[in-house]
């Protein structure tokens, strides 16, 4: 089973997940709060309750992939892969939302924090895990100043 290492600040937690598990579901099951709002109230209240609950529309579950991007579901599916995904949903073999890649790309496109970091940012609700990876939850970004366009992350 794949191992996912979640990093939040100085905290690190490693969990084993079945292959194909949606990253957001794995984090929630492990007790990791992935939804983030820039202005938080009392222990993550806004992030916990005011989000799209895994449909890929709000962008609050954005994560930074620091290792293992090749083991995550792709951002783009071929027509055949999309058709197979739809058939599997109809048969109850796959969960809707596991690979809504157009929605993921659109949501990340709207977010300032992903500008210049497109290769590292993913929405945890839109990513299926197929191998070991390291994920930074609620990554901090310099959204102003002279270092805005720097790319210090390993996937670039």
Model-derived regions, located:
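Signature of N-terminal electron-transfer/Fe-S-associated modules in redox systems
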Residues: 1-156
